[in-house]
From Swiss-Prot:
Catalytic reactions of this protein: acetoacetate + butanoyl-CoA = acetoacetyl-CoA + butanoate; acetoacetate + acetyl-CoA = acetoacetyl-CoA + acetate
Protein source organism: Clostridium acetobutylicum (strain ATCC 824 / DSM 792 / JCM 1419 / IAM 19013 / LMG 5710 / NBRC 13948 / NRRL B-527 / VKM B-1787 / 2291 / W)
Active-site residues, Swiss-Prot/TrEMBL: 51
Name of the molecule in the record: Acetoacetyl-CoA:acetate/butyrate CoA-transferase beta subunit
Keyword presence, DNA repair: no
Amino acid sequence: MINDKNLAKEIIAKRVARELKNGQLVNLGVGLPTMVADYIPKNFKITFQSENGIVGMGASPKINEADKDVVNAGGDYTTVLPDGTFFDSSVSFSLIRGGHVDVTVLGALQVDEKGNIANWIVPGKMLSGMGGAMDLVNGAKKVIIAMRHTNKGQPKILKKCTLPLTAKSQANLIVTELGVIEVINDGLLLTEINKNTTIDEIRSLTAADLLISNELRPMAV
């Protein structure tokens, strides 16, 4: 188990970055997913979209270089590439709902073995709402969940989500600091494992049946 929160997030973001392909239009959700833009190889051309109205979003700026008028969907400072563009949210969501986004990377509170996603509310707590997640999970061609494997020691990958769902059966891939899990028809398939953990540990921290790939390999970070 990796207890260093910042290290865990870095591992996840680096691995998700390796999942993206040259030329794709990619949406990054709020929080951890926005870190992915910092780890794209320089020879790759990935176009990042933010649902508040940016196409061509770049990496996070240095603190002394941040433009207070340029923020991503989570309200964090971001950069925009020279060929980037700004537009209103109606155009942004037309891109999403029209199926033009190749990949969306989202955080989650829970994911289950059916690919169901819960990422917008904990009953009894005040939250801002679902945001664009419900559009993204249905409009994007591939949905990657980027999240810590547990929350305060409790599994976030479950047999069945207990929180209100954002979408049913829409997650394609789950990336945590411990490994990479594909959502397949038979359930959850562990395809990559962090070199600092074991299959037994991952299973003990996962509240769902976990299939092990015959081609299980070290996590590529």
